[in-house]
A protein has these predicted regions:
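TPR/TPR-like alpha-solenoid helical repeat scaffolds
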Residues: 121-132, 160-182
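N-terminal cysteine/histidine-rich coordination modules
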Residues: 1-38
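TPR/TPR-like (Sel1-like) alpha-helical repeat modules
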Residues: 107-111, 143-161, 174, 188-190
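Structural signature of alpha-solenoid helical repeat junctions
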Residues: 78, 98, 102-105, 118-126, ...
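Amphipathic alpha-helical repeat scaffolds of TPR domains
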Residues: 34-47, 56-64, 74-95, 124-139, ...
Length: 193
């Protein structure tokens, strides 16, 4: 039986419920500790997340981390990553509705991160962020944003962008175009029938 490392990315304090990942900043702005105490710790029934986690415990840990990140005002790049991992966990349960919900939330947080460039001090590049926005947009069938962001990734090849990601963007752009053409043919055939 293989251990899924994704289940253990979030650290949860068994005493107060504060949850975080290694991506969180160490800084707490004034009033944040009190807010975490009011929103989480005061309602927390002490229990630990040590030992083997189920997918449901992993989901609980990520949701707690997202709440803590929101209260702490972590960067959008951090919250986007938490939401994306929640989408993956729901995908593993074949819960399409929740998967799509968290993909959309993640995509929106990546767009915020991209627009204010809060990813600059991380390992993420603008090309990677644009690709993720494009791919999440494609998956939630927001083809307008998918096209826009894949096109931006592809345009970076003129300035020596990341070749592997540019190729991935081209593949996804072509896949999206083929899917949309197929849908258009199906609609046309239905209207002729």
């Amino acid at each position: 039986n293989q251990v899924n490392a994704l289940y253990y990315n979030v650290f949860v304090c068994e005493h107060c419920g504060f949850s975080f990942t290694e991506d969180f900043s160490k800084y707490f702005s004034p009033g944040v500790s009190e807010e975490i105490n009011n929103q989480i710790s005061s309602k927390w029934n002490p229990h630990n997340f040590r030992g083997e986690r189920t997918v449901f415990q992993a989901i609980e840990a990520y949701k707690l981390a997202f709440l803590c990140a929101t209260l702490k005002k972590e960067k959008f790049i951090v919250t986007a990553g938490l939401l994306l991992r929640l989408a993956w966990l729901y995908r593993s349960l074949k819960d399409n509705e929740q998967e799509e919900r968290f993909m959309k939330m993640s995509r929106d947080h990546y767009i915020e991160s991209y627009s204010i460039e809060d990813y600059r001090s991380t390992q993420m590049s603008d090309v990677r962020v644009m690709y993720i926005i494009g791919e999440l947009s494609r998956r939630i069938e927001d083809y307008s944003n998918a096209t826009r962001f894949f096109s931006r990734v592809i345009e970076t090849q003129r300035t020596g962008g990341e070749a592997k990601i540019i190729e991935m963007a081209k593949e996804q752009w072509n896949l999206m175009r083929a899917t949309r053409e197929h849908e258009h043919v199906d609609v046309k055939m239905e209207s002729e029938a």
